[in-house]
Amino acid sequence: MSFTDRPSYRTAAPMTDFDARALAASLAEILGPDRVLHGSEARRRHPGDMSWLTYVHAQHGRPLNGQDVVASPRSTREVADVLKLATRLKVPVTPAGGASGVQGAANATCGGILLDLRSMTRVRNLDRRSLTCTVEAGMIVKTFEEQLNAQGLSFTHYPASAEWASIGGCVAARGSGVLSTKYGTIQDHVLSAEVVLSDGDVVQLPALPRHGVGPELTQLFVGSEGTLGVVTAVTVRLRHLPAHRKFAAYRFDDLARGIEAGRRMMTSGVRPAVMRLYDREAAIHSLERAVTAGLDGETMIVMFDGDHPTLVDAEAAVCRDICAGEGARELRPGIGEAWWDKRYVFYYPPHAPQLPQIWCTMDVAADFTRIEAVYRNVTRAMREAVDPSWGMTVKTHLSHWYDWGSMIYPRFGIPKGPDDLDAALDLHDAIVRAATLAAIEAGGVINDHHGVGMRLAPYLERQFGPAGMRLLRRIKHGLDPDHVLCPGKLALRPEGQGERPTVTPAA
């Protein structure tokens, strides 16, 4: 597939009822009949992820959730037994957790088995002295955080999708959370992992992330989107709940001055727990709807936290000086507090987009040298990709910062897309293609933390280069030679393979 081709949104034809029943019977011997679904019930109960692609295909009667059977293991041993069976029968397996992704990665487009990990929710070990915790992959992030908060602790990885996202899903997509600027993304939280390979081997990786015992294999599976192995548990770092939080908000004359303020903070060691910079359109038409503060242009919200108020105040003071040095005007701190209290309203009606709209939130990373050019090129490419008569809006903010750069969140929205599915996909794909290629050409990386999924798979070779893709394919072949795990995801389909191999499971 050329990197400019539309992603494949086809779903494999379902197994015959006989084959699906036979596969379900084999799985029931492993899990028990109450934890196996097949046929239309398997698809009805598990409709797919939260991407626009999933919603619009379902609306038009062409759903992307093509699983023939759903299997719900409760233990690592059961996961291993399911994978052994699947490998023997050459049946595709797609692991899934909360299905909160927005790229289509958790959709079982090749049919076969959807491995529902949501029953694996145990906290296996909590070490209060080392501030580490071993938790199973099906645990929902919000539930985990609430359990920790009751003990004065925090995971500090808290994505916008925390109410639905599973720990394993965050690991699979290399996710990020609202506090990442200080506490890091999921890769910084994960210390070790338990992984089941496609042949059923269970790998328990070293319990410490810093060692000289060869490569750090845990990180091989972070961001692998289920293609290399099934992560069944992870050991993660924890923190104490902060005793103090301090908010501030600033109005900049333009986005470039705001980016420079953020760069100066990050490169001087100042670490806000939250730093969100909104361009004019996002400040006026998104943030303002939540905080009601009369915002009229580029706005930055920052939050500092910690156990020692003197240190929190000192960092906030340095931030104030840096922002003032970039010409910013300080706004009332209640704006930041209002955002914090309402930070999840954006994901519910009336704030969240709904069909018949077309929407997509991209997340593109770049270093500080290139981030402004990436912002300009990507947002311009989005606007130029479609006729103005569609009334598309583009609203952008920067919310995950690093000591080397940041990322942009440009969300495009079209109030009403075409009634025809293929025409709607053409419109959506034209915008995504233009923005993705513009990001690459400007020196950016096409995704920061939402993952690749179906939407970005055609562009992986352009991002990695031919040699990089050959390396990734060699890793895939070494760990999953039969391509049982998520075939085709991460552009890792073997040559000549269709949407799903022909499978006739044994009765």
Residue ranges of predicted features:
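Alpha-helix capping/hinge segments and adjacent helical runs
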Residues: 32-36, 433, 440-452, 477-485
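FAD-binding subdomain of flavoenzyme oxidoreductases
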Residues: 121-276, 500-507
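Conserved, mostly hydrophobic/aromatic
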Residues: 86, 226, 480
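C-terminal substrate-recognition/cap domain of FAD-linked oxidoreductases
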Residues: 37-53, 240, 251, 257-434, ...
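Activity-critical C-terminal alpha-helical subdomain
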Residues: 201, 452-507
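Conserved phosphate/anionic-ligand binding catalytic regions in large, soluble enzymes, centered on
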Residues: 101-106, 170-171, 217-232, 401-405, ...
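N-terminal flexible segment immediately upstream of the FAD-binding catalytic core
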Residues: 1-84, 102-131, 282-290, 335-360, ...
